[in-house]
Design a protein with these regions (language model features):
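C-terminal accessory/tail domains of diverse enzymes
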Residues: 1-76, 92, 103, 170-386
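Surface-exposed, active-site-proximal loop segments in enzymatic domains
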Residues: 94-96
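Metal-dependent DNA replication initiation modules
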Residues: 83, 87-89, 98, 103-119, ...
Length: 386
């Protein structure tokens, strides 16, 4: 079974007022823990789980990372909120460092205005050949993951009308978005090298494809999602992502070609996902026709169900998806919080509360659906091969 892990980016807010606080560097210096790192702006903080094979181990680690981040932030008078953009106005303070200085110099307002928080899922692959085959086959499904994660309706005090405005703000980077089919690892690396030779990206880390080969670990890194307000939703997206990767790898080994969906169509699907989330109609990844968002999410589940069943994760994935479809995404929760008094501070305080709800791995309502815990991988170090 393939290892997988989650990186989450959080907004740092004042523990009293809820306003964004530029204390990212202070939080990292307080922690002495490599699971916490700085982001482009001081108002952000990133966490990273270890790689795991068992979903319950991943959920426990994710909960520990959120707790670690919030407890450390409290030492400097801040809290962490799983908000993909800031509901309240923010004048970002850049993180110090030569790389960040170069990014700001090159990209101007696009960089200095980029207070956006995403969720990245890593899934182990055997080698670059398998990884690129996976990238080619998962691309039409990625907008569905975005729709399931949508958690950024507000931007600097304004209602954007989007379920994920982060996806719009992030799309201003020239290296961001969906890619054409690569076909081979050689073509993938040639494409990346050609982009670097334009002197637009600062380095490999700025190859912001929706999904890419990670340049440090033997993983496919899926980067399309908002940070999820609910930790359960992050676990669901990780499960679906691993299911997509394994399904794609099996198709490649069986000689099944990727769907030749035009990149422009994938981009339209991503726009719909960001605009409406799970509250409207999405483009079906196979037919590219608008369909009910819930039906499209179920189509994704059906696509990866054989793999989930083989891995013993089908019931927990189905339970998590049912929960999400019933209560809505973080975007819906944010809008509900604002509707009470029309005060964006309520959105932030509710996000802080939900972000830091106590979790014990897979939450109680899903444990009946989850398979029995398999052997522990607590001592597993480093990214393993599948």
């Amino acid at each position: 079974m393939r290892t997988f892990g989650i990186e989450e980016e959080f907004l740092l807010v004042d523990a009293v007022t809820g306003e964004p606080r530029p204390v990212g560097r202070q939080v990292v210096e307080q922690s002495f823990d490599d699971r916490l790192t700085c982001e482009v702006t001081q108002e952000q903080l990133e966490t990273a789980t270890r790689p795991h094979r068992d979903v319950n181990d991943l959920a426990l680690d994710l909960a520990r990372c959120r707790t670690l981040a919030d407890e450390t932030a409290l030492r400097v008078g801040a809290r962490v909120a799983a908000l993909a953009t800031s509901p309240q106005p923010v004048l970002p303070l850049a993180c110090p460092g030569s790389r960040y200085d170069e990014v700001r110099e090159r990209f101007a307002l696009t960089a200095s205005d980029q207070v956006t928080c995403g969720c990245h899922v890593h899934v182990a692959v055997e080698d670059d050949d398998e990884g690129v085959a996976v990238l080619d086959r998962i691309r039409p499904w990625l907008p569905v993951l975005l729709a399931l994660s949508t958690n950024s309706p507000y931007w600097n005090g304004a209602d954007t009308g989007y379920a994920s405005y982060r996806s719009q703000a992030w799309g201003r980077w020239p290296m961001a978005g969906p890619c054409d089919l690569f076909g081979t690892a050689e073509r993938y690396h040639a494409t990346v090298e050609a982009l670097l030779e334009t002197a637009v990206p600062v380095d490999l880390g700025q190859i912001y494809f929706d999904a890419r080969l990670n340049h440090q670990y033997p993983t496919v890194e899926v980067r399309v999602s908002d940070v999820c307000l609910y930790s359960d939703d992050a676990v669901l997206i990780a499960l679906l992502t691993r299911g997509l990767v394994e399904t794609a790898a099996r198709e490649w080994h069986a000689g099944v070609p990727p769907l030749e969906i035009p990149t422009a169509t994938v981009r339209m699907a991503s726009w719909r996902a960001g605009r409406f989330g799970m509250a409207g109609r999405l483009l079906h990844p196979v037919t590219a026709t608008p369909q009910d968002a819930g039906d499209v999410a179920l189509a994704l589940l059906q696509h990866v169900r054989p793999v989930l069943r083989d891995q013993g994760d089908a019931e927990i994935a189905e339970s998590l998806l049912r929960q999400l479809l019933a209560r809505g995404t973080g975007a819906r929760r944010q809008r509900a919080a604002l509707s009470r008094r029309g005060d964006l501070r309520d959105v932030v305080s509710e996000a802080v509360r939900v972000t830091n709800l106590p979790r014990g791995g897979i939450t109680d309502q899903h444990e009946a659906a989850a398979r029995p815990a398999s052997r522990s991988f607590a001592g597993f170090l480093g990214w393993g091969r599948p």
